[in-house]
Amino acid sequence: MTKAYNIIHHKFDVVVVGAGGAGLRSAFGMAKEGLNTACITKIFPTRSHTVAAQGGISAALGNMGEDDWRWHMYDTVKGSDWLGDQDAIEYMCKNAPDAILELEHYGVPFSRTEDGKIYQRPFGGMTTEYGKGKAAQRTCAAADRTGHAILHTLYQQSLKHKVQFFIEYFAIDLLMEDGECRGVVAWNLDDGSLHCFRAHNVVLATGGYGRAYFSATSAHTCTGDGGGMVIRAGLPLQDMEFVQFHPTGIYSAGCLITEGARGEGGYLVNANGERFMERYAPAAKDLASRDVVSRAMTIEIREGRGVGEYKDHVFLHLNHLSPEILHRRLPGISETAKIFAGVDVTKDPIPVLPTVHYNMGGIPTNYHGQVIIKDGKNHNSIVNGIMAIGEAACVSVHGANRLGSNSLLDLVVFGRSSALKAAELIKPVSPHKPLKKEILEKIINRFDKIRHANGNVLVADLRLQMQRTMQSHVSVFRTQELLDEGARMISEIRNRYKDIKINDKSLIWNSDLVEALELDNLLDQALVTVYSAAARKESRGAHAREDYPDRNDIDWIKHTLSSIDDSGQIILDYKPVTLTTLTDEISTIPPVKRIY
C-alpha cells in the first residue's frame, strides 16, 4: 500500500507535534540547545488554541501584595481535590516566577501597574497564607488577551532559533517499535503527500479534546489528536473522567467569558437578583474554584432560579464596573459579549452557562514531560522516544480540577522542562535505527481504509451524536444510570464508525477526510472518558456523582489509567497519586475537606 502514496522521509533529532504555547516553548527550547528540531502543526501556529486564553498566567510574584510559591502550591493541590501529584505541582509553582520573567524578557506585553510592575489580578481558588488569608492577586495578565500575547511571542522565538515548521500537516500516527517511539507520520494537506518523520524524541503538544462535547469553549481543531495516537499505540491515558466545565460560557454560543471578569469584580446572579455564590462559597464567593461555581449555577437552574425565557442560564454582571476599567482590563470580553450575546456590558448583564473548557486528563507523564506507563510495581516506567506536554498531557498538576490561570503556566513550565530533558538525553544529529517496513505499512493501510470508506453514515451525523451524548450523559452532575447508558451509546457510536462514508477521495485539502480522522481520535477519548467516569464511585473535583456525593479518600486517591485493546474492550487500571513533595522546602499537603 505504501507504493500507492508519495511518501517523503525526514530525519530529525526531535519532532514536536502541535504549535500552541507548549509546543512552541518546547520546540525553540530544543533548537536553542542545538537539537535539529521540527514542528508539525495542522494549522498556522498563531491560530493554535492558546491564542484564545484570556485571563492570565499564575505566578507568586508578589507585585500586588505578599505572595509565596508555597501558597500557590497549596491552592493548586486543594484545587486538584488532592488528585494532583505534589512533586509535579511543586516543580510548576516553584518555577512559575522565573517562567514569567522569561516571558517578559522574550517580549510578552504584560499589563502594568502604575509603578511599572506586571499587573496581577485575583482568580478563583487563589489565596494567601495556605488558604487562611485573603484572596491572592497572582494572575499576570495582558489585558484579557494573555494567550494571544504569549503565543505570538513564543512563535517569534521559534523563528529566531530556526525551528523547522511543517505547517498544515496532519499527524496520523506514531511510529512505534518494540515499545519505543521512533517517529510520526503526517499528511501534508496542501499537496497530498505523506511524510515519515524519524525522530529520537516525539513531543505531543496537541491540546485537549473539548470537541467531544456539543458545547465547548474549544476551537473546532481541539480534537485530541495526540491522545488518539497514543491510544492506538496501545498506551494508556490518565484521569480522563475529569472534564472541566467553565462557569461562564456565553449562553447558546459557548464562547468563553474569562474568570478574570469575576477577578475584576464581576458577579453572578439568579432570577431573584441574588448573588447566589455567597450561599455556596461564603469566603471566596464568585471566585471559588471552577467546579464549585459550575455546580452552584447548575443547582440554581435546576431548582427554578435560572433566568431567561426557559430559565436555563444565569447572569454575569459587569455593568457596575467603570467603562474605563472594562476598556483597559477586559476589552476582548466587551467585544465578545456584544458579538455573541448582543449585550453592552456597561449597561446589561451577560447570559452565561457552564461550558466544557478543559481536560484535566491526558497522556500520563512525569514533570520532565516523558510519557510514563505502569509496568509491574513500577508505576512510572518511562516510554522511550515520546513526550507529552500541555493539555494533551496529564503530569498531573491539575488533578481533578484545574485552577484558572494555571494552564498557561503549565504550557511554558513543562514546555521548557521537556526541552531541557531532551537536550540531556539526545546527542545532536545522532543516527537513527532502521525501522521495520511493516510499521509504516500498517499506518498507511489505516489511512487508506478511512480515505476510501464507502459506508452509509456521514461523519458529521456521527460526530453530532457523540457530542450530544457526552453533553447529556457525562456532564456537570453524573449518576451511574446516566454514565452506564452513556457508555453503551458511545460504544455503539464508535462501532458505527466502521460504516462511515467519505465522499471526497482526494488528498489535497480534503476536509471530509480530516474530519473523519479527527472523529476517530475523539471517539476513542470519549469512550475512555465515560467508562472511567462510570467506574469512579465518588465525587472529586469536576467529577460530581449525585449517587456518590462525597469524596472517598480511602479508596479513590488514585489515578485512573484507561486504554482500549485490539478487540475494542476498555481496560481500566489504577496507580497511586504522588503525595510526597519534590524537595524539603515544603511539606506534604495532607487531604482535608475542600471549602471555599
Swiss-Prot record:
The protein's annotated pathway: Carbohydrate metabolism; tricarboxylic acid cycle; fumarate from succinate (bacterial route): step 1/1
A GO term for molecular function: electron transfer activity
Record: residues binding substrate: 246, 258, 357, 402
Residues annotated as the enzyme's active site: 290
GO aspect biological process, one term: tricarboxylic acid cycle
CC terms in the record's Gene Ontology section: plasma membrane
Enzyme Commission number(s) from the entry: 1.3.5.1
Record keyword Flavoprotein present: yes
Keyword Membrane recorded: yes
Residues found modified as Tele-8alpha-FAD histidine: 49
Cofactor(s) named in the record: FAD
Binding residues annotated for FAD, in chain numbering: 18-23, 41-56, 225, 391, 407-408
Compartments where located: Cell inner membrane
Reactions catalysed, as given in the entry: a quinone + succinate = fumarate + a quinol
Keyword tags: Cell inner membrane, Cell membrane, Electron transport, FAD, Flavoprotein, Membrane, Oxidoreductase, Transport, Tricarboxylic acid cycle
PROSITE patterns listed in its UniProt record: FRD_SDH_FAD_BINDING (PS00504)
InterPro entries assigned: FAD-dep_OxRdtase_2_FAD-bd, FAD/NAD-bd_sf, FRD_SDH_FAD_BS, Fum_R/Succ_DH_flav-like_C_sf, Fum_Rdtase/Succ_DH_flav-like_C, SdhA/FrdA/AprA, Succ_DH/fumarate_Rdtase_cat_sf, Succ_DH_flav_su_fwd
Membrane-topology descriptor: Peripheral membrane protein
NCBIfam families for this protein: sdhA_forward, sdhA_frdA_Gneg
Membership in a protein family: Belongs to the FAD-dependent oxidoreductase 2 family. FRD/SDH subfamily.
Assembly: Part of an enzyme complex containing four subunits: a flavoprotein, an iron-sulfur, cytochrome b-556, and a hydrophobic anchor protein.
Protein name, per record: Succinate dehydrogenase flavoprotein subunit
Natural source organism: Rickettsia typhi (strain ATCC VR-144 / Wilmington)
Name of encoding gene: sdhA
